């Protein structure tokens, strides 16, 4: 029997389930995006059309090629011998999907394809096949991807998920194929192997889950319920084979003793469900009745499966939030109290409702109901199911996903993240940087800074203005967390948060937590330890990236004095270029951190100096001279270890004079601070050669915040 390549499309997220389904039909396939591909006969393709609960469309793969202009497209389509696929007296229709780099207009692609096909038939037969968009004999599908065009001949036009039984439905209907997918994922096929399988949908709506479960229990081929289904009349079509396979499917139905029950509190919805059940012919298996989910009782003799897609998120969310949460809280109580040993699966896009169930999930899987992203949460009701304690991470996730439901203003924040990332990508590729600022209060209502550290995000919330409602500010902050997770595909546990004033530099170093968890990041040829949880800052200032490079370059094979050295990142860069470094800081914690940074870079820390001291006091007694000095003081400090309070605007003249006393006559002092209203002392400008290098030190990712720091290069006259 002749073999072909077929592509079977499905809803995004169920590809593996479809692959397994084809395996059960004796067909080996490969997982692709939004479908699977297999080599097989027309009979194999017919079996998928008849028996698949999950497939949307079955297509014969005709050809694939790279196409860069309209002439390429015409020649590619013309190179296919269309008379091998259908006769000139058969009508056809062209559908286009995907996106192509060079073709923005899908109507143009369709027209060019039609021209190539019609011209080929006309040149050979002096006749042309006609287009029929309503009831064609054949459907040709072009899928565009980057610069490639994939050509398929469809075996069916209407999606296989349409079963025709669902003539009465609610406001947010669940696709039949998705209902089947969550049943399979939840374990219904395994449940059917039991002596008496049991399935409950306690929020059944119009009954889609119940009906799909019954079809599987009775081994009813889905295509038998699709009254609109039409197999296309291509030259490969074998009507006798198709009719024989349909007859086998009809004769394969069986009687089942499965118990399938649905409940809902809405009588109008239950009436729709009952009519759909009769339409599907499964009224002998499925029963429905009115019941509040909070009154759910276990009247069964053995354990079973509960699968549901709650409609309450759409019906009640908003003014009736409290009732919504109470419904799910009561549902969780009923499960933990009366359904020991049962398995439960809940499909929802409203994560906060799951939290209210107070049950520990065993598995979470993402599915799509059309364009709507949903999650299937699975539970096993046992002694470990009930939550004893909500972790801070779980709480943050719950609040973030609930906040995202309260308004859609965070969509602008998400779009800005995407726009900024797209803008930075060429620069990031060129520099190889993995740590950078992605967003800095670009939208006033989302006053946060988003710093990317490879797979982690450091999210700083600027303290809200007193005129801003604190609840609104909190909601926006959690919406930002949600969109960072969703838009940037960052795990929630990798989003680390801080609340602070806008850019005060190293104004305070107090310890925030005590997790003591360090991560390694790369910056050019150096590696550094960062800590996202225990301190106000991470251990590296991303906005100082360029001045670190300037300092390191100037100090190559020379001596460097790093004052207010923090975690010694500038010293590491310089040491990697052969500099002999001296790092001075008041904090022994940060100096030890700095030593660890040296060791991380395979630099012998013993060959460098680390001095714990008040920098002003140390400079007053220092006798050594250095080629390069990096002076990066905090804006303000009142540490007990200091002899006096440091105010950078007031004290910078003293600091610079003391630092210059330790600088060789041909040396360079790099002076940096983060005080936005900083003004250089006229006496310093008069005494030394001072050049402002703010623009030189401003990295691509900080262009929107040009006043983030003041940088100066100072030399002797």
From Swiss-Prot:
Pfam family, any one: Methyltrans_SAM
CDD domains the UniProt entry points to: AdoMet_MTases, THUMP_AdoMetMT
Keyword Acyltransferase: no
Entry EC no(s): 2.1.1.173, 2.1.1.264
Lineage: superkingdom: Bacteria
Keyword field: Cytoplasm, Methyltransferase, RNA-binding, rRNA processing, S-adenosyl-L-methionine, Transferase
Record's catalysed reaction(s): guanosine(2445) in 23S rRNA + S-adenosyl-L-methionine = N(2)-methylguanosine(2445) in 23S rRNA + S-adenosyl-L-homocysteine + H(+); guanosine(2069) in 23S rRNA + S-adenosyl-L-methionine = N(2)-methylguanosine(2069) in 23S rRNA + S-adenosyl-L-homocysteine + H(+)
InterPro entries membership: 23SrRNA_methyltr_KL, DNA_methylase_N6_adenine_CS, RlmKL-like_Mtase, RlmKL-like_Mtase_CS, RlmL_1st, SAM-dep_methyl-trfase, SAM-dependent_MTases_sf, THUMP_dom
Gene Ontology MF term list: 23S rRNA (guanine(2445)-N(2))-methyltransferase activity; RNA binding; rRNA (guanine-N7-)-methyltransferase activity
GO cellular component: cytoplasm
Main location: cytoplasm
Domain THUMP: 44-155
UniProt similarity note: Belongs to the methyltransferase superfamily. RlmKL family.
Job description of the protein: Specifically methylates the guanine in position 2445 (m2G2445) and the guanine in position 2069 (m7G2069) of 23S rRNA.
Protein name: Ribosomal RNA large subunit methyltransferase K/L
Species assigned in the record: Francisella tularensis subsp. tularensis (strain WY96-3418)
């Amino acid at each position: 029997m002749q073999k072909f390549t077929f592509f079977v499309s499905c809803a995004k997220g169920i590809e593996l389930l479809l692959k397994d389904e084809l395996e059960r039909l004796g067909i080996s396939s490969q997982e692709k995006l939004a479908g699977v591909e297999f080599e097989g006969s027309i009979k194999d393709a017919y079996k998928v059309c008849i028996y698949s609960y999950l497939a949307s469309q079955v297509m014969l793969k005709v050809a694939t090629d790279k196409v860069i202009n309209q002439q390429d497209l015409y020649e590619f389509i013309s190179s296919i011998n269309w008379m091998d696929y259908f006769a000139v007296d058969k009508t056809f229709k062209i559908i286009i999907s995907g996106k192509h780099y060079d073709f923005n207009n899908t109507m143009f692609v369709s027209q060019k394809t039609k021209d190539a096909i019609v011209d080929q038939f006309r040149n050979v037969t002096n006749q042309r096949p006609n287009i029929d968009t309503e009831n064609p004999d054949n459907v040709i599908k072009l899928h565009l991807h980057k610069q490639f065009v994939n050509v398929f001949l469809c075996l069916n036009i209407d999606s296989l998920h349409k079963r025709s039984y669902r003539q009465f439905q609610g406001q947010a209907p669940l696709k039949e194929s998705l209902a089947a997918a969550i049943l399979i994922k939840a374990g219904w096929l395994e449940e059917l192997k039991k002596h008496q399988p049991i399935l409950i949908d306690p929020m059944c709506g119009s009954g889609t889950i119940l009906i799909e479960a019954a079809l599987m229990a009775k081994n009813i081929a889905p295509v038998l319920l699709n009254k609109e289904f039409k197999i296309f009349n291509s030259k490969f079509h074998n009507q006798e084979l198709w009719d024989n396979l349909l007859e086998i499917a009809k004769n394969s139905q069986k009687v089942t003793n499965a118990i399938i029950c649905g409940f809902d509190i809405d009588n109008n919805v239950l009436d729709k469900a009952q009519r759909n059940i009769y339409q599907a012919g499964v009224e002998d298996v499925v029963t429905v009745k009115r019941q509040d989910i909070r009154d759910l009782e276990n009247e069964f003799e053995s354990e079973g499966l509960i699968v549901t897609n709650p409609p309450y998120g759409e019906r009640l969310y908003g003014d009736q939030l409290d009732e919504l949460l109470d419904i799910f809280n009561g549902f969780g109580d009923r499960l933990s109290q009366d359904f020991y040993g049962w398995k439960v699966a809940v499909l929802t896009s409203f994560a906060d409702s799951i939290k209210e169930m107070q049950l520990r999930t065993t598995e979470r899987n993402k599915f799509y109901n059309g364009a709507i992203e949903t999650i299937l949460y699975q539970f096993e009701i046992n002694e470990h199911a009930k939550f004893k304690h909500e972790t801070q991470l779980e709480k943050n996730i719950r609040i973030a996903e609930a906040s995202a439901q309260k308004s859609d203003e965070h969509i602008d924040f998400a779009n800005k993240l995407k726009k900024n990332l797209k803008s930075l990508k060429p620069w990031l590729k060129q520099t190889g940087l993995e740590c950078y600022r992605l967003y800095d209060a670009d939208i006033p209502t989302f006053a946060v800074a988003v710093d990317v550290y490879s797979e982690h995000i450091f999210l700083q919330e600027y303290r809200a203005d007193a005129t801003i409602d604190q609840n609104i500010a909190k909601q926006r902050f959690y919406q930002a967390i949600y969109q960072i997770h969703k838009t940037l595909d960052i795990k929630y546990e990798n989003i680390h948060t801080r609340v602070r004033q806008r850019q005060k530099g190293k104004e305070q170093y107090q310890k925030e937590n005590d997790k003591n968890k360090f991560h390694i990041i790369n910056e050019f040829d150096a590696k550094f330890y960062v800590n996202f949880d225990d301190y106000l800052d991470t251990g590296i200032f991303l906005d100082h990236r360029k001045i670190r490079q300037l300092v390191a370059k100037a100090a190559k094979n020379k001596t460097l004095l790093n004052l207010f050295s923090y975690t010694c990142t500038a010293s590491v860069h310089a040491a990697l270029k052969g500099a002999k470094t001296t790092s001075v800081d008041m904090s022994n914690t940060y100096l030890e951190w700095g030593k660890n940074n040296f060791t991380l870079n395979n630099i012998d820390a013993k060959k460098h100096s680390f001095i714990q001291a008040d920098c002003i006091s140390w400079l007053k007694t220092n006798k050594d001279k250095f080629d390069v000095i990096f002076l990066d003081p905090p804006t303000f400090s009142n540490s007990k270890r200091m002899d006096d309070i440091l105010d950078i605007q007031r004290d910078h003249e003293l600091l610079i004079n003391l630092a210059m006393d330790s600088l060789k006559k041909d040396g360079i002092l790099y002076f940096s601070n983060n005080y936005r209203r900083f003004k250089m002392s006229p006496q310093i400008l008069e005494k030394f050669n001072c050049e402002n290098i703010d623009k030189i030190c401003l990295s691509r990712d900080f262009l929107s915040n040009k006043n983030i720091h003041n940088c100066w290069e100072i030399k002797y006259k």
